[in-house]
């Protein structure tokens, strides 16, 4: 009996030992699948899509920084609200109409090549022909000032038209994210990936996009050093700022060509014929009209509250962004200096967004929807109030003490404004977007589809365009006004907007709980 027991013990322990490596391997495989869920046979497809996305997003971040640098330092930060409402919005509608026509007449692959090539051709023309000769091409400062004196209420429109090439560059650069990324890239990727693949691919794409922001920021931060190196290496005679614009847009052109080549390889070498048969760019399904959107929002309190969140976010961010950019021009007076400043801001935005991505899912899972949803308005409100307090009352005793630390009082407002933008954008890309999408989940199918379309159309458009229109209206009525002079007024609108936002989150939480309970 004893021998048998010993034998059985020995057998049991041997069996345990045999199983241990198997269990460890299983755990390692599980962990590696969690960190890197891409299968071997999908690797080339994933890497090529990733490279294409990287090129498009890197371009997006470079031209976003460059357009702000040129317009704020060479025309004025106040003109941004005019460009957003009177320039970008009509051109976005025009671009959508052109795209619908192309979809009905051309092959999907050729649409991509045509649109990206037009963007790149304009950037090349701007870098090497328009910007170096902008003084010849633009209206003379004397003529512009004479026109402003005779038509003071149209001051900002005259400034934008007198420097038409800078305004045009801003509009084209603003169209890139909507056309190249949201439309061309995502339509292509959604057509060639299965639902099962998307669950594993898309989270990694999200992480990559933030890495792209960080790297673009680092490049812009070091722009002046790159500029100096290029001048020394090639003995160039071009002006410092012209060279900065040319360096940025040369990188844009190189990345654009790499992107086109990557797209071609995906179409002809990587994807099989079965995938290619699925590739058809589609004109968006008939979107709801503004009247239909209003009707949908008015019929559902749940959707009304989601739309309120989107409107409040858009207004609050734009109210702080304008005065912050205007304050930054006091210190960063040239396009090169301003681009380096924006680069620093982009680097921090990328790093903090990655942090929020890691923390975000845990906050929702452990603390619930309300806690995750209220974090973004709290961040926007506290940092925004701090910025306005510093910007409006920078002569107070506390700020004099702080100015010894930062050497220049104007830097205090700029630094707090940068912190406000970094934290607000980081939490928006993660917590705000995810909780907003979660709020649709418990609704019934019809309200979910139509309600989302209505809230996205009205909420996003009213948030961005509404804020830009209000600000441009103030500058039309008061042509001598600047962001500094109307900052106190903007602060009160900002406070009211954030209070409505807090109320909407609280009320939406009640609606969300009711809908979840009802759907179970």
Curated annotation (Swiss-Prot):
Topological category with respect to the lipid bilayer: Multi-pass membrane protein
UniProt xrefs under Pfam families: TLC
A single cellular component GO annotation: plasma membrane
Main localization (coarse): membrane
Molecular functions per Gene Ontology: ATP binding; ATP:ADP antiporter activity
NCBIfam families: AAA (TIGR00769)
Record's protein name: ADP,ATP carrier protein 4
The organism of origin for this protein: Rickettsia bellii (strain RML369-C)
């Amino acid at each position: 009996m004893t021998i048998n027991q010993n034998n059985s013990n020995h057998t049991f322990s041997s069996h345990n030992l045999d199983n241990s490596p198997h269990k460890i391997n299983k755990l390692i495989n599980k962990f590696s699948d969690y960190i890197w869920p891409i299968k071997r046979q999908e690797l080339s497809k994933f890497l090529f899509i990733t490279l294409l996305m990287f090129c498009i997003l890197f371009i997006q971040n470079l031209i976003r920084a460059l357009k702000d640098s040129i317009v704020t330092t060479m025309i004025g930060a106040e003109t941004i609200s005019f460009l957003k409402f009177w320039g970008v919005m009509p051109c976005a509608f025009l671009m959508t109409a052109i795209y619908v026509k192309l979809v009905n007449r051309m092959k999907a692959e050729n649409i991509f090549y045509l649109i990206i090539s037009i963007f790149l051709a304009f950037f090349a023309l701007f870098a090497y022909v328009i910007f170096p000769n902008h003084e010849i091409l633009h209206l003379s400062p004397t003529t512009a000032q004479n026109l402003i004196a005779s038509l003071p209420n149209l001051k900002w429109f005259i400034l934008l038209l007198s420097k038409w090439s800078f305004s045009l560059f801003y509009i084209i650069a603003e169209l890139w994210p909507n056309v190249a990324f949201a439309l061309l890239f995502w339509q292509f990727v959604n057509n060639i990936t299965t639902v099962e693949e998307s669950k594993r691919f898309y989270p990694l794409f999200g992480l990559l996009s933030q890495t792209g922001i960080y790297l673009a920021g680092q490049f812009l931060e070091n722009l002046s050093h790159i500029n100096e190196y290029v001048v020394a290496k090639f003995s160039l005679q071009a002006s410092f700022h012209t060279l900065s614009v040319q360096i940025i847009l040369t990188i844009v052109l190189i990345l654009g060509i790499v992107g086109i080549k990557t797209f071609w390889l995906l179409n002809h070498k990587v994807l099989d014929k079965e995938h290619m048969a699925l590739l058809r760019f589609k004109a968006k399904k008939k979107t709801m009209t503004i009247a239909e959107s209003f009707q949908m929002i008015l019929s559902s309190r749940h959707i009304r509250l989601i739309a309120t969140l989107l409107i409040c976010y858009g207004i609050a961010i734009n109210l702080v962004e304008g005065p912050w950019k205007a304050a930054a021009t006091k210190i960063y007076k040239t396009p090169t200096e301003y681009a380096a400043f924006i680069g620093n801001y982009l680097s921090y935005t990328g790093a903090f967004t990655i942090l929020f991505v890691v923390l975000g899912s845990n906050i929702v899972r452990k603390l619930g929807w309300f806690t995750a949803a209220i974090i973004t308005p709290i961040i926007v409100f506290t940092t925004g109030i701090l910025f306005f307090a510093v910007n409006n009352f920078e002569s107070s005793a506390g700020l004099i003490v702080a100015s010894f630390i930062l050497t220049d009082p104007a830097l205090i407002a700029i630094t707090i404004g940068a912190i406000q933008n970094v934290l607000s954008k980081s939490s928006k890309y993660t917590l705000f977007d995810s909780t907003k999408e979660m709020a649709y989940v418990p609704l019934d199918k019809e309200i979910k589809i139509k309600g989302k379309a209505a809230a996205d159309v009205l909420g996003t458009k009213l948030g961005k365009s509404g804020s830009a229109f209000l600000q441009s209206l103030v500058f039309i009525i008061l042509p001598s006004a600047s962001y500094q002079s109307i900052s106190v007024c903007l602060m009160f609108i900002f406070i009211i907007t954030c209070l409505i936002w807090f109320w909407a989150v609280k009320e939406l939480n009640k609606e969300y709980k009711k809908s979840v309970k009802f759907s179970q």
